Amino acid sequence: MCSFIVTNRKFKDEELSKINYFTQLRGPDVTSVENINGYTFLHNLLSITGELTTQPFEKDNIVCLYNGELYDYDQEKYKSDGESLIDLYLEYGPLFTQKLDGEFAIVLFDFNKDILVLSTDAFSTKPLWFSEEKGEWGIATYRTPLESLGFKHCTKLKANTIRVSKISSHILVQEAPVVTYDLTQHKDTFDDWTKAFEESIAKRTQGVREDIFIGLSSGYDSGAICCQLLKNNSKFKAYSVVGSENIDVLSQRNYLMQISGNDHDLLNFTQPLRNIAHQHIENNVEEFKYTIRSMSSDYNEYWLSLKDDNGSNGLSFISSLAKRDTNKIYISGQGADELFADYGFNGKKKYPHSNFGGLFPDDLNTIFPWPSVYESSMESYLAKEEHIAGSYGLEARYPFLDPKVVQEFLWTTPELKNSNYKSVIHNYLQENNFPMAVNEKIGF
């Protein structure tokens, strides 16, 4: 993961280390600072693919900073993915991020046209915060740099949003979605979803320079990721925390890992180890309050801090081991619960923040987007993944949040959606004869 800070608010050089503390952890390879047209552009680089390329990108008085990974850029024309962004803006205009395939947060200043573009991908997998006060802009990967600069009112850019403003007057010119989904439920097989998922794993793992790791439970989501990586003959390492897992399923998956030649660590997360993992969070992760709620009840978890989530401690533990083992690319299963099951099945909630008990209606327009598509547990657990993995200098990638994977699920008929818990993944695991525990929701 990379990170950035942009502002035209003045600060002292000796304040920079405090301002950049949490964000610098995400990009430990190179920190670059440039002053352009009265603005400070700071970028922290985590180099994962392509040549080591510092930012910002500049061309014809247009300046761009970027955090994430693009999977469809012209590798013959550009030595890194971010170098393609200004050319795409010049070709397609302020809504150019609609043409991107990847996970990203982008800020682009066109000083010629007085235009500022802020955009994340459809699910805001990479965070982006901004503030506009007294004629000054503050834009950053995290909230804390803006607060350290003295900004009082900081806003997280909404998921699936392109925000176009005037640089000088701060006037909002336009907001548009990055991805628009078709809610017609017309496909009566899982074939196209399976193909999209296979392609999503491939684009996030093939031809990478750094090593890959996953957290492997006995559940559906990590099982599907593991299965596809094994099918692709990918080199990767799996870390499993035993305890609440289905040990029979986990043992079978461990056997498949062994015969593939990939490493699989079975771990006991003892209280002393939990304390160490939690202390890392306290020291290196900024505060983030969860936004989890249900649209069908008054249940919420607004009181819960990312720092106190048990899953945060588990991810911190696994991330510490991945960093020790020099594995930098984390393939996350985030999003499957929110999109393919709504934390329930057949109208019965598995967790109280479920919105409709996983019973998909004949007309998706009546519920889409339900809160956990873009907000609620999606926003909260993505923050957990990004903040924790980022604090160890690791990059998280999200195959279940690929727009094609999501669209193919939405296109399946209600009968297919409701045929089994997490129907698309259930079918995938069955077709591949991969060990699974039917209808179990497993994880930290």
Regions found by a protein language model. Give the residues of each.
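Short linear loop/turn motifs
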Residues: Q271, V438-F444
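Cysteine-centered catalytic environments shared across enzyme families
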Residues: M1-Q279
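ATP-dependent adenylate-handling active sites, centered on carboxylate activation for C-N bond formation
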Residues: N8-K12, D114-V117, P127, Y181-N433
